[in-house]
Amino acid sequence: MAAAALGQIWARKFLSVPWLLCGPRRYASSSFKAADLQLEMTQKPHKKPGPGEPLVFGKTFTDHMLMVEWSDKGWGQPRIQPFQNLTLHPASSSLHYSLQLFEGMKAFKGKDQQVRLFRPWLNMDRMLRSAMRLCLPSFDKLELLECIRRLIEVDKDWVPDAAGTSLYVRPVLIGNEPSLGVSQPTRALLFVILCPVGTYFPGGSVTPVSLLADPAFIRAWVGGVGNYKLGGNYGPTVLVQQEALKQGCEQVLWLYGPDHQLTEVGTMNIFVYWTHEDGVLELVTPPLNGVILPGVVRQSLLDLAQTWGEFRVVERTITTKQLLQALEEGRVREVFGSGTACQVCPVHRILYKDRNLHIPTMENGPELILRFQKELKEIQYGIRAHEWMFPV
């Protein structure tokens, strides 16, 4: 108990300002500038996917990428260049010690042919927080966003316009120290690549998934780095995902603590739409307590629901005991995950301690999920103007 309490105090006081633990040169105000952006167009453009051609997530890349190098002397000039392999020293710290972070966001092409990014400011905020946590160099968020906008502008013909498609944007920042010592890197590399994508899960946006909830596996913990988007958080989940598939489930429901708190679904945030034990209809999602990744779509669903004002919206711990009781009493309406890749994903079954728990999400419409999906689609594809969208 004492250790847990100390961990929570440490998380509150120090994880919010991790730059205090790193050398000051990484957090100087200097940054690369979009005005200095250099452009080298490809001489060998790739064949673009044709109309109706399946867009498997993360398999197809556009013609160009953004690259910015950093050393302890500061940032170099940003450049847009032909998509190409990286050249890394075999001792690069990103390869050995996971000094790497990434982001994921989407650009959408509306019927007016305007390309728009969805709430990219939140991604820039989160990326900078992740950089500070790893003692990687700071940067100006608006300058990076402008460089990304220019990159998308160069490859705008790659943005698909079919229903459910988008351009996935993957910014990455890695330590590139050519040394086997575990230390703050004096070299780093920031790059951005683009992928035209379709729906994340086979079957479309309303295909429900089943979850393996095994308390033997833990994704993140208080005082750790589960609330940052770091590459090292994802590799260890592959084995558990394979175990879920072996047991007939599509995804993993990550549990935490002796009371088996619901935290995340695969790489998604989790929501429960139910009648609380006090009789009030509510939408609940776990709080940002250091274990949960602050998802952009998560925040968007909370914002939308609060705007509607039709039911209680709350960030609160959810335990498996509470979920089991609510299922037995018929109070659960919908359970779903949210994330940039999948947007909103229904859950229809949870395998927990050899028990198959039926979740009545699909029997209930899923009314709330479909409403969220409709609202997001109208905003993202420019069907109605919204301040969340950033024009390219």
Swiss-Prot record:
KW DNA repair (keyword) present: no
Pfam families associated with the record: Aminotran_4 (PF01063)
Location of the transit peptide in the chain: 1-27
EC number of the protein: 2.6.1.42
Keyword set, alphabetical order: Acetylation, Amino-acid biosynthesis, Aminotransferase, Branched-chain amino acid biosynthesis, Lipid metabolism, Mitochondrion, Pyridoxal phosphate, Transferase, Transit peptide
Membrane spanning stretches: none
Cysteine disulfide partners in this protein: none
UniProt KW Ribosomal protein keyword: no
Residue positions where N6-acetyllysine is found in the record: K321
GO BP annotations listed: L-leucine biosynthetic process; L-valine biosynthetic process; lipid metabolic process
Subunit structure: Homodimer.
NCBIfam families noted in UniProt: ilvE_II, PRK13357.1
Protein role: Catalyzes the first reaction in the catabolism of the essential branched chain amino acids leucine, isoleucine, and valine. May also function as a transporter of branched chain alpha-keto acids.
Protein name: Branched-chain-amino-acid aminotransferase, mitochondrial
Organism: Pongo abelii (Sumatran orangutan)
